[in-house]
Amino acid sequence: ASDVYKRQGNATNLSKGNLRVNSSGRYLEYSDGTPFLYMGDTAWELISRLNDKETELYLENRREKGFTVIQTVILDELDDMDVSSNGEPKLIDGNIDKPAPGYFTHVDKVISLAAAKGLYIALLPTWGDKVDKQWGKGPEIFTPENAYRYGKWLGERYMNAPNLIWIIGGDRSGDGKNFAIWNALATGIKSVDKNHLMTYHPHGEHSSSFWFHNASWLDFNMCQSGHAQQDFAIYQRLLLPDLKKEPHKPCMDGEPRYENIPINFKKENGRFGDDDIRHTLYQSMFSGACGYTYGCNDIWQMFDTGREPKCDADTPWYQSMDKQGAWDLIHFRRLWEKFDFTQGKNQQTIFGNIPLENKNYPVAFGNKDYLLV
């Protein structure tokens, strides 16, 4: 893409104040009342795997493409607790009550590098495998008690960061023993950090609302439509019900199908492409979502030669940053900046009784002044 498409200047204007939910309970805004668009990229392994120079390269690429938020993790899924990009362990002796100073200085730097570009960091304190191992590396290290202490420590450390959004969870449910741990982690952070929004990242084809809609710490809902479904039915199951829940909370798809990931994780099915990005982006936003997160299979894991590929990753992350799907977001952002989405709503009634095909399901959005289809 030519330079004409690139965003000029910082990703956002952090001087507009902390983020909050607007009065409608549907959208996000700065404390000065200016609407905020959550336009996320998925970089789960950013902190663990990229050094300072690589981090700068990645963040600058995302600023140019109009992203406003980078989703990443402190205690990640793929690498051991004693492995990180700066050679420091993440925890001393694997003890959650002993965060390693060197690693957290690196976390600080990533947040600061992003802030300098006006990018928010949507930060997961841990991936879900440290709470509920299942298919991750683990180990399970959390109890409700130490999760609260870790959360409070994080809240004290980052409460004044100008560019932070908290994400609890990490591809896991809130059921069973998990519920008390996630709740304690969130409550620990919020016990000291009153400045930042918080949501929850669930496992595939689920929403944070399934367990935490009424939790005082959950400011907005996040669903994961996941990497198997290919039509609008998944939003009819997840996003549309969330929009109807009381009390109203903003909602969004925080993990739709990734560009270049095998469909349903099977190579013989082919891979999701840029058209899938546009489908999920416009279908969710025109339904009334407050934001959207893009993902690329090679970037979430920061795949490179010499690293074990997950989900059949096949291209180094730095060669994957300019895929068409990533460029598509800046066009939506310009549309969003032209029309006041906070004053619009879904307008499906314009289709009348026309039979609608589910895979290419048309969605309309607007108000008396504009209509987008």
Which residues does each PLM region occupy?
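Short, small-residue-biased leader/transition segments that mark boundaries at the very start
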Residues: 1-5
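Active-site mouth of glycoside hydrolases
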Residues: 24-220, 224-232
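Helix C-cap/helix->beta junction micro-motif
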Residues: 117, 192, 246-247, 287
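Active-site clefts of carbohydrate-active enzymes
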Residues: 172, 218-220, 239-275
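Short glycine/serine/threonine/alanine-rich loop segments
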Residues: 67, 119, 249, 289-290
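Charged helix-capping and loop-helix junction motifs
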Residues: 182-183, 235-236, 271-277
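Low-complexity, Pro/Ser/Thr- and charge-rich linker/hinge segments at domain boundaries
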Residues: 6-30
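Aromatic- and carboxylate-lined catalytic core of secreted/periplasmic carbohydrate-active enzymes
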Residues: 34, 250, 259-261, 273-373
